[in-house]
Amino acid sequence: MKPTKEAMNFNTIHDLYSSVGLGDKIDKKCEFSIFNLADIHTEFPYISPVYRSDFFSFLFVKDCDGKLGIDGIVSDAFPCSVYFDNPGHYKNFTWYAIKEVYLITLTES
């Protein structure tokens, strides 16, 4: 879960969702999105690659079992928690089960 030279880089929100097969569900110029990760990740465990994004991310955790890593620091994803990160941070996720987790992404514009 540590940043590496092999980390993926997502310049746009569309790039992020294209990487999980949802590129056709979001406009290429999208600057704001909300998704329930339970609708995206249905097979577990799901382990994301380490990636860097050029947009803000808010993760609203209501009910799940998982871990998240930001810049190599790993923590459990606790129910009733909110996580935030700025553009440029390295991150990744490991999900063992997701019932309700919302990812809100937005650009600086």
Question: Language-model segments: what does each one mean?
Answer:
Residues M1-G66, S75:
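Generic protein-terminus/edge-of-domain signal
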